[in-house]
């Protein structure tokens, strides 16, 4: 863990003190949940610091003496046109280096304060770990609201949850487009499963697959030009590819086995999927152009399903049955080594963060369905705070 001190943000107008406190809370909560940082207390003996504080050898030495490898300091103020101005700086106290910062301008709202906090945390995370942050991303999931199923979009910490679609019938299998502007999903609103592509900014929906029988499990290709879907129009479940507007339907798998739950590889060359062709549900892959024969990927245990490939193409998340529990596993696709990253007993629907270092998944806790997250090495596991229970089918959005 990296020892880091985050000094309270200075509110240049006392009336903005609550905004400054919220900004600090968001930044610290984001950093804390990664497990990569040790957040050091900033006691009253330390004078207030802001982006305007003079940076010199004395300041670096002061914070090194308090065991801080990094220091964050910033301020919040109002511009003449009543915009909120947030500024911060990040210091590497070990190397006595100024690592820069951001100057953010936005309307004066609590929502925008939270967004600024996420952007600050993204900057800190990337500069200190070398990996892109993921705090400014969005989550999609389905929650129960009485008799309704509500497709919901929220910030990465579960805050600012907004409904995108309400239906009396189930909504499942959410998948973000690579550009983050669309969601593909399956809706039962017509009395059968149909694949839709939903433009989030406008609410416009396009039918991507409504063939005879079942239409399910959409997955985007990395270039966003193609969806892999599962259809039963010719009998047992098979995988097809189709354009997001429903054109250019093409069959990908051909067997008497059930083939389902596709996920494209990071380079788009392969489609990973679940099949029972060997007698039990296992993960296979096939070339996305349909050439060659399927290759089996998982061999541990009698149930491995719901594969999803990380954005960088290096990891595979899937649901496995281990000792009677359903847990989320991560496989390194180069070494084929596996690690269990969840506790069970009923974990499902893994989805990678856009930096490929985290997964989100649904968990059954007692009689409640909640969202959980874990690092890909399984060392850090957490619940995502949400106001509602009955939450399923999470999907982690792309970087903005």
Can you describe what each PLM-predicted range is?
Residues 131-137, 173-182, 217-226, 262-270, ...:
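Blade-terminus and WD-like Trp-Asp/Gly-His loop motifs, strongest in beta-propeller folds
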Residues 53-123:
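Amphipathic beta-strand/beta-sheet edge segments enriched in Tyr/Trp
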Residues 155-172, 198-216, 242-258, 286-303, ...:
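Multi-bladed beta-propeller domains
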Residues 2-59, 72-76:
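Short beta-strand->alpha-helix linker/helix-N-cap micro-motif
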Residues 73, 139-142, 182-186, 226-230, ...:
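Residue position within the beta-strands of beta-propeller blades
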Residues 83-85, 147-152, 192-196, 236-240, ...:
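Structural motif
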